[in-house]
A protein has these predicted regions:
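Active-site helical microenvironments for divalent-metal-assisted chemistry
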Residues: 1-159
Length: 159
């Protein structure tokens, strides 16, 4: 069984040298999403949610490191595969009924929205660049809203 510290080490190493859309270390995002988790399972999945998608690390590599199967299942669901539409990707998470993956995806969207808003406020950019960033913020916000509504509808259907 891996500790939170082991998982953080894996995430930090996987994102070493990577930058986000405004030049900040990409690892800051996965650390933030992990810290948003309400329990160790959500935290571990949050720290690892972009590892398979953004690096050469595979689910089998994580398994070999001792990452628990519950975490691997969530990370697998949270990995956006090439060729899959974003809408289908989110639907797969919701359809899975995997509470960990669903909560981590909501945390991910929430943090993406927050950092895009911060970037818009702090970047010294041209009007065109600001508009592009604003468009991205609105797109993230719309995805967040659609995902939350879809999840809520799915939860209500189960009751």
């Amino acid at each position: 069984m891996t500790t939170i510290e082991d998982i953080i080490r894996i995430a930090v190493n996987a994102h070493d040298g990577m930058k986000d859309m405004v030049g900040n270390p990409a690892v800051a995002h996965v650390l933030a999403v992990g810290l948003m988790g309400k329990n160790p399972l959500e935290q571990k999945a949050g720290f690892l949610h972009d590892v398979v998608e953004d690096s050469d690390i595979t689910l089998d590599d994580l398994r070999a490191e001792g990452v628990e199967e519950d975490v691997l299942i969530a990370v697998d669901l949270l990995t956006h595969r090439p060729g899959m539409s974003y809408e289908d990707y989110v639907k797969n998470i919701v359809i899975s009924r995997n509470e960990t993956a669903i909560q981590v995806k909501l945390n991910d969207l929430h943090h993406n929205l927050h950092r895009a808003e911060l970037a818009l406020m702090t970047l010294d950019t041209s009007t065109r660049e600001r508009q592009a960033l604003l468009d991205e913020i609105l797109s993230i916000a719309a995805m967040h809203d659609r995902a939350e509504r879809y999840i809520q509808r799915s939860i209500v259907k189960d009751r």
